[in-house]
Amino acid sequence: MPTPILDFDALAQTISGRTVLCIGDIMLDEFVYGEVSRISPEAPTPVIVAQRSEIHIGGAGNVARNVASLGARCIFVGLVGEDDAGKRLAAALADQAAIESVLVCDPSRPTTRKVRFVSEHFSTHMLRADWEQAQPASDEVEAKLIEAILPQIARADIVLLSDYAKGVLTARVIRHTIDAARKLGKPVIVDPKSLNWAIYRGATLLTPNRKEFAEATRSRADTPQSIVDASEDVMRLADCEAILVTQGEHGMTLVPRNGAAVHVPAVPVKVRDVSGAGDTVAAALAVSLAAGADWDTALRVANAAASVAVSKLGTAIVSTAELRRKILPHAYLAAEEKIVLEPAALDAQLAEWRTQGLRVGFTNGCFDILHPGHVKVLTAARGACDRLVVGLNSDASVRRLKGADRPVQDERARAEVLAALEAVDLVVIFEEDTPIDLITRIKPAALVKGGDYTREQVVGHEVVEAAGGVVVLVDILQGFSTTALVHRARGGAK
């Protein structure tokens, strides 16, 4: 059975009004990129010639960044040390308009910092150096974390616990958070690190990777069915509604407490870096569920987001636009990309076509209710050139030409219908009563109109012919008229 097309734009619109409370272990991720061409004379180890470096908000902070990049607001609660790395993280979070950070400072511990040395040519991690103290937060710091977390729960639509086992998510912090969230009816997602899943009791969803799941369940977890078989006991132990096990190139398996398990294969992509891919999955699930998506939709969004994340270098974030391109069918996107809104984009496309030696044609109209007469003209117009640009009257232009009760469909809807036609290569909306400015800009090799016009009546014929182009008149189909169709639809006689 084919997968139905997801109304991604509606989902994204809902996500934009949601807030995720993210709690967990933040860290400073540094990437040093360079080339390796020799072995050190001092020891049998490769020498990396550093060429550039990048700094990112990592760990649970990367989850927060992905929540924000996917369109939701994020409240982030984490722990830093009284050091330079902590100050850099605080400053970086302050630069994120969609993230509100509440950082608890513990002077007795360093801010977690990870430096990765990467061979740029081979996209290979050569070495990682860590600065961290993984012991659980002290009783005093625990109390400060709980005090910071509890007031934020009511402000959020969903709570996300990102556990990197660096001391923030102690059993006490987790218990206070989940109990408070459940009391307020807020779903809780946990990306777990502890093997004792009893501490996550009451969470809505657990999102372990395959290794974490296998260790926690003491199972092989090497097939979707083995994951399903091993899930029953731990779901009862954790009192959760579902478990999602991520399996890298083998996809994801969702096991809900009620209903059938679902396995989705990974989206085929060239994997460049898996750093932070789990963060992206957790964030995508959180924003989807916060927006009211069902399990299948949330799983689909998370799987697509993961495929975008692993195709990037470094601790990656995924934007709404990238996710949209990954989820929606190519044909849908191809049609959408035919609609040009900026003159610069039109000029660039025309220049590219002409560099390729392609003849550009042009026709125009209101195209309010597309009918066979329109299709015949558009098909014939495409036959007179290599690439067809359609000028579309804006809503204001149509009202001036056709009356206050037109258009029936707005300009965006009319543009989308035209763009879906194979004969049409580009749609450009114009505000004027005639397309003369657009024709002057394009200077098409062929200017096409229906045969109910004479050559002299075709707007822009002088411009086109002066530039060496031709005017093409196409025989029209009798009996088809948008005005007549509208009249009939409103109860008029045939």
Swiss-Prot record:
InterPro entries: Bifunc_HldE, Carboh/pur_kinase_PfkB_CS, Cyt_trans-like, PfkB_dom, RfaE_dom_I, RfaE_dom_II, Ribokinase-like, Rossmann-like_a/b/a_fold. This is Bifunctional protein HldE. Residues 1-334 are annotated as: Ribokinase. GO terms for cellular component: cytosol. Its EC number is 2.7.1.167, 2.7.7.70. In the N-terminal section; belongs to the carbohydrate kinase PfkB family. Residues 362-494 are annotated as: Cytidylyltransferase. It catalyses: D-glycero-beta-D-manno-heptose 7-phosphate + ATP = D-glycero-beta-D-manno-heptose 1,7-bisphosphate + ADP + H(+); D-glycero-beta-D-manno-heptose 1-phosphate + ATP + H(+) = ADP-D-glycero-beta-D-manno-heptose + diphosphate. The keyword Oxidoreductase does not apply. Catalyzes the ADP transfer from ATP to D-glycero-beta-D-manno-heptose 1-phosphate, yielding ADP-D-glycero-beta-D-manno-heptose. Disulfide bonds: none annotated. ATP binds at residues 209-212. The gene is hldE. GO terms for molecular function: ATP binding; heptose 7-phosphate kinase activity; heptose-1-phosphate adenylyltransferase activity; phosphotransferase activity, alcohol group as acceptor.
